[in-house]
Curated annotation (Swiss-Prot):
Protein's name in the database: Nucleoside diphosphate kinase
Function according to Swiss-Prot or TrEMBL: Major role in the synthesis of nucleoside triphosphates other than ATP. The ATP gamma phosphate is transferred to the NDP beta phosphate via a ping-pong mechanism, using a phosphorylated active-site intermediate.
PANTHER family: NUCLEOSIDE DIPHOSPHATE KINASE
NCBIfam families given in the database record: PRK00668.1 (NF001908)
Catalytic activity: a 2'-deoxyribonucleoside 5'-diphosphate + ATP = a 2'-deoxyribonucleoside 5'-triphosphate + ADP; a ribonucleoside 5'-diphosphate + ATP = a ribonucleoside 5'-triphosphate + ADP
Organism from which the protein derives: Thermoanaerobacter pseudethanolicus (strain ATCC 33223 / 39E)
Cofactor(s) needed by this chain: Mg(2+)
Length: 135
């Protein structure tokens, strides 16, 4: 069974969207394997976003993601990575279609509500970072 990581970002937590987002995943057949509310450390975020280091949005992204609690979850199911990516919608808010999580709730590309692993390999790496007890 495939697993993936999804994170409701600080703006989604502050706006009370955890239940709505989780419901969308569960309605598509995904199961919640693990979850926690956490205010991520700079160290955790630097490891998570290491491939973005040096890009202009890197520091603001780290600041934003460490600004408050997030809801990190491991979801399990057939094609979990692909399903989460499709439900999340495009990263850029102007490209996110209505009916997707970002299309319905994102305010900007920076405050885009949700993270989802972009591949099976990324999911394994990210789950090990956020949920070392599952590794």
């Amino acid at each position: 069974m495939e697993t993936t990581l999804a994170i409701v970002k600080p703006d989604g937590v502050k706006r009370g969207l955890i239940g709505e987002i989780l419901k969308r995943y569960e309605n598509k057949g995904l199961r919640l394997k693990a979850a926690k509310v956490i205010t991520p450390t700079i160290e955790l975020l630097e490891k998570h976003y290491e491939e973005h280091k040096g890009k202009p949005y890197y520091k603001p992204l780290i600041q934003y993601m460490s600004s408050g609690p997030v809801f990190a979850m491991v979801l399990e199911g057939e094609n979990a990575v692909k399903i989460v990516r499709l439900l999340n919608g495009a990263t850029k808010v102007e490209e996110a279609l209505p009916g997707t999580i970002r299309g319905d709730f994102a305010i900007s590309t920076t405050f885009n509500i949700i993270h989802g692993s972009d591949s099976i390999e990324s999911a394994k790496r990210e789950i090990a970072l956020w949920f070392p007890e599952l590794a």
